[in-house]
Amino acid sequence: MAFLLRAVPRLQGPAAWRRPLQQLWCRAGQGDSIRWVGSRSPPSQEKPPGTETEKFHTIYRFNAIRALGFLSRLKLAQTAVTVVALPPGFYCYSQGLMTLSSLGLMSGIASFALVMLCWMSHFFRRLVGILYVNESGTLLRVAHLTFWGWRQDTYCAVSDMIPLSESEERVQDVFVRIQQYSGKQTFYLTLRYGRILDRDRFSQVFGTLATLKNSK
């Protein structure tokens, strides 16, 4: 996974990624607010009332999340093709048009594709793409992926977030867990490959980075 994160930003020709990803996330208006472009809006979990008019500041961004969303949807399509091909394979075997070893190979590929899809989706759904904090610093908005590879916003109270200084996480690791006292959600962010855009607001939520690096 770390190799994939290093490779994504080095891919030549950003236009090659931009074309299939233009319907993912794009900037709307001024500032760092991100809106969904497409036929439907992304679902939000437990969206507090009044957030439509509240101003949010971007404090963290992981640019490779767009490529991972595209990869997730590509993997979903590939898995669907392999699974759909199984019934015709069984029919061909029953008619003597396919050997048992070929059918077993096809079934193995489909099973492996399903396992990989479940693993990738489980991780990608918890990988943070963008973090926002409202003006008063009381509400955290987490932009991450759904099972289908589309964007989803989850709202968390800042008071419910466990600071990294109180957790056993090492900020030097590739992925760092961010958890809630209530245990509702667990997300992962990468301080190594992501960018902290507002250190002051980030520190108000997760603790001062200088202190964290010295304590780990």
From Swiss-Prot:
Lineage start: Eukaryota, Metazoa, Chordata, Craniata, Vertebrata
Family per similarity comment: Belongs to the TMEM186 family.
Keywords for the protein's UniProt record, in alphabetical order: Membrane, Mitochondrion, Mitochondrion inner membrane, Transmembrane, Transmembrane helix
Quaternary structure note: Part of the mitochondrial complex I assembly/MCIA complex that comprises at least the core subunits TMEM126B, NDUFAF1, ECSIT and ACAD9 and complement subunits such as COA1 and TMEM186. Interacts with MT-ND3.
Disulfide cross-links: none
Ranges facing Mitochondrial intermembrane side: 92-103
Species: Rattus norvegicus
Function according to Swiss-Prot or TrEMBL: As part of the MCIA complex, required for efficient assembly of the mitochondrial complex I.
TM spans (from-to): 69-91, 104-124
Annotated protein name in UniProt: Transmembrane protein 186
Compartments reported by the entry: Mitochondrion inner membrane
Listed GO CC annotations: mitochondrial inner membrane; mitochondrion
Protein origin, superkingdom: Eukaryota
Membrane topology classification: Multi-pass membrane protein
Mitochondrial matrix membrane side: 1-68, 125-216
Gene Ontology BP, a term: mitochondrial respiratory chain complex I assembly
